[in-house]
Amino acid sequence: MNKNSISLKFKHLYEMFKPTILSVAIFFSCGEKPQNTTFDITKHIECSLEDCIEEYAIYPLKSDIPINQIEFGMAFDSLSFYKSSNSKEIYYFVNNEYISKLASIGRGPGEYMNINNYTYNPYNNTIVISSENEKFHIYSLPDMNLVRTVNRDGFVKGMYPLSDSTILTVNHCDEKFQNGYGIYIVNVNNGHRTLIEEIPYINSFWFSGNEFTQTDSSILIPVSGCPNRIIEYKNNKISDLATITFNNNNIPKEIYAKEISTIDEKMNFTNFFLENDYKIGCFYPIITNSLTTLWHTPKINNQYQFMMLAYNNSSYINFSFHIPGINRRIIPDYVADGYYVLIIQEPIDYLIDTSESLSKLGKEIIDTMKKQNNNNPILLYFKIKPSILNEK
């Protein structure tokens, strides 16, 4: 794998709020009539990650200074960016070498603001940040100097660059429905936004960071809501590639609804899922001609299971992965160039599972971590085998 070929991709994993799907109906559009298949989440297998990937690579993030706990990663060619877990900093790397850091946004101590999310804009080499005070902050690279601050409307849950002055966003929309969301094109020079797709209901915990995924010719937007959708933005148009809806198994009839149409339905639906600790959605879809994969965390027997659903027109399996000898749940932190990416930053003593022997991959991970200055993070890139369903 050539790291320099990595296209602009975005992370979207939040550790606490992940989807639960007891069984779902999913409709994939493949140029012909969409197919309707019911997926049973209990149909899953556990296996070693090494048995299910066709290639992988490990990259240490190189820095002479300590890197705080990071999340919300993204990559563009040789450039990569990470937000600190405390939502205060953004780190900038080239070829995995530390270049600079945005230490804070705001006027000074006591007035620093949290970074809700951000995107790199390759068209003008800037970072666009959405802060907690309903503003866009644009910073130049590599010096991280403030270029301008622009007022914005609504809470922004995700951003993706379209040109030097416009970005694609998912953000709060009150035009037609209370507390709804929409997909917008926003001008970051003046904050003006144009609604291109309404989303009447989405999970309030969805899109804590960027989940957009870029293909060769389009942008994929996974929407966790009712229904869940994988939306494609291509040639200035929006279309659904997949629609994922719940079956009503284990969900009371008065709660279950394929389409949320009223505020009362929305509140009942939301309250039920919160009170029963259910989560909904789909994350990190990668769609090819032969295979679709996406991730979810169903709650089975009162325990969260971290799973990847692999699907084609004839079969499907839910996979739970592990790396022998490594104490680390396997669910990606972002997608880059068709690869899933894990940010590994746990202490080595915690990572090593003494109950089993280290696999070849596990040994490479530990050896790389031991060489890191300041216990800084490393990245594990991996690509799922296209034939994974045929081998299980």
Q: Where are the regions a protein language model picked out?
A:
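A short helix->beta-strand "capping" segment at the edge of beta-propeller domains
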Residues: 41-67
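Blade-loop segments of beta-propeller domains
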Residues: 98-124, 131
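Repeated scaffold domains used in trafficking and secretory/extracellular systems
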Residues: 68-72, 113-118, 154-161, 204-211, ...
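Surface-exposed loop and turn segments in beta-propeller and other repeat-based domains
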Residues: 56-65, 100-111, 194-207, 241-271, ...
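Asp-box/WD-like beta-propeller blade repeats and closely related beta-sheet repeat scaffolds
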Residues: 134-163, 169-175, 195-201
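Beta-strand-rich domains and repeat architectures in extracellular enzymes and scaffolds
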Residues: 57-88
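Short loop/turn segments that connect beta-strands within beta-propeller blades
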Residues: 93-97, 140-144, 187-191, 233-236, ...
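Short beta-strand elements that form the blades of beta-propeller/WD-repeat-like
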Residues: 77-85, 125-131, 165-176, 216-224, ...
